[in-house]
Every structure is written in C-alpha cells, then in structure tokens.
Amino acid sequence: MGSPGASLGIKKALQSEQATALPASAPAVSQPTAPAPSCLPKAGQVIPTLLREAPFSSVIAPTLLCGFLFLAWVAAEVPEESSRMAGSGARSEEGRRQHAFVPEPFDGANVVPNLWLHSFEVINDLNHWDHITKLRFLKESLRGEALGVYNRLSPQDQGDYGTVKEALLKAFGVPGAAPSHLPKEIVFANSMGKGYYLKGKIGKVPVRFLVDSGAQVSVVHPNLWEEVTDGDLDTLQPFENVVKVANGAEMKILGVWDTAVSLGKLKLKAQFLVANASAEEAIIGTDVLQDHNAILDFEHRTCTLKGKKFRLLPVGGSLEDEFDLELIEEDPSSEEGRQELSH
C-alpha cells in the first residue's frame, strides 16, 4: 500500500497536467459542479431495474412506432378510397348516358338530306340541347354547298331551325321515303301500371317487356336502345307518322328500331319506336303480338308464341312471382317452336 503522501502527490500532478492542457486564452474559472439528477446513476453505478426494463423497452418502442405509422397510413388512405368510391358511384350514375353524340358533317351530297336531318334531331334530343346550342351545332356541322345555303339566308331565318331545314331539303331534294306499315296517326293508350310482364332479352341485355294489349305500337325507352346498340344512330330509321298519347299530346319519337327479342331460346323480330313514352323500359303492343299470332291467357297468366308458352308476371307482383323462368310449356309438335329467328 502506498503512503498518503504519495497519493497526494499523484493527485496534484494530475491537476497540474489538466491546467496546462487548457488554452492560454481561456482563464481558469472556478464553477461549482452541478449535482447529478437523483434519477441518473452515478459513475460506475449500475441500476438493476434499468437492466431489467431495457429489453422490454427495446420491444415496445418499435411496436409503438409501427402502430403510429399504420394509423398515419390508414388516415391517408381512407380519403383516397372514399374518393374512389364516390367516383365509382358517379360513374354508375352516369352509366345511363355514356355517350356525347356529335353530328357528322353535311355538305349536301355525303348523306341523304332527310336522313342527316333526322340524325341531327335525334342527337339534339339525346343531348337535351337548348335552341341556341342546337342552332350552333347545326351551323358548325354544315360544309361546302350546304354551308353556302345557310349563309345565303337572312340572320332572322338562320335563327329558325324549321326555316334552315326547309332550305336544305329544297336545295338538295328529298328522295322518296319507303312508306311505313303503321297508320298515319296512332293513339297510344297504355295500361298505366296495369298488365303483365314477359322476361326476355334484347341482345345480351335482360329486359322486362310490358305486354300491353291497349297499346297499338311497341315502344322502348331511349336508355335501353342506347345500352343495346351502344348509341349507334344508324340503327334508327325516321318515323314520319304521328303517335298521340291519351291526353292528345304528340309523342316525341327518336326513330324506328328493328331488332330481335329473345324469350328463352325463342327469337322474334320486332319493331320498336324509341321514345320516352313511359317509365317502362319496353312495351310490347298489339303490333308485335299480332305479327307473331300471340295468344294471351290472362286467367292463367300465360302467353303462347310459336308453340311455346311463357309465364306472364303481374305488374307490381312480389319477387316470389319472378321465379326462374319464362318458358313453362312447349308444344313438341309445333315446328314453329324451334330456335331460329321467327318472322
């Protein structure tokens, strides 16, 4: 063991070295040493509690961090997902009108005049243009000599669609149109919520056809026509006759649509007027029923077509009435009951 004097000498020597290690410019200032916080260990002291809690803390801290990151991700993702859902809802709402119809140019010779004007009027109705918009698109669609006919009209006449139409037809002639098999004036008196449905299809689109013996013509809603044809205006033919509803008003008709109706495996040719005549998507009137010699039995709720008997579903009936299927009986001796397209 060393003597107390030797220990004192070593301590003074260390203090002397520390003093000489300080920069000359830094005067020695005597500062009181701040006491260490009571919660921290002193030098050389180990707290057993910290050793025991260290592994636990090393697990909890990353877990909490991951939790906060996950919550932040969810908070950022929810508005985006909500936005996507809202957009999807908007698209589904817009599904009924997916097309922005634009008239093709007309120079007087590229298209038969009355067919072009009919197509233009259909586009006007589908797009719900006002009068000013209709006239603007009319002028912008004209080319060449057709535009010359328009420019030679007075400003007042240019603002009247009927006058412009008459001038174009007079300038380029109207070829004879094929006569329609329909009468000149027809009264459309549907059953107004009464009647029976047939379940079928047009193309690949499922349709509930209202069988209405009170309607002289068959009608489909423009939305159904657009869904089946993808808005193909070439599928519409002009309708020159007049159809009046029960109150005497004239029905606005976009055109005549020749298509095929599928009832089970049976296909029938049918001609529909495309018009927003009622809330029904499709109405089968007496014209189609008579063309195919349909036999309606309202007592037993059946409709017989080409040897096939189909169930009629009551309007406003319960869902239980709409069980699978339509075809309930077939006459095996009937050659007309085959799958070919019936005329």
Swiss-Prot record:
One of its GO terms (cellular component) is membrane. It comes from the Eukaryota. It is found in: Membrane. It is an enzyme of class 3 (hydrolase). Residues 1-55 are cytoplasmic. Residues 207-288 form the Peptidase A2 domain. The keyword Transmembrane helix applies. Expressed primarily in the granular layer of the epidermis and inner root sheath of hair follicles. In psoriatic skin, expressed throughout the stratum corneum. In ulcerated skin, expressed in the stratum granulosum of intact epidermis but almost absent from ulcerated regions. Expressed in differentiated areas of squamous cell carcinomas but not in undifferentiated tumors. Keywords: Aspartyl protease, Autocatalytic cleavage, Disease variant, Glycoprotein, Hydrolase, Ichthyosis, Membrane, Protease, Transmembrane, Transmembrane helix. This is Retroviral-like aspartic protease 1.
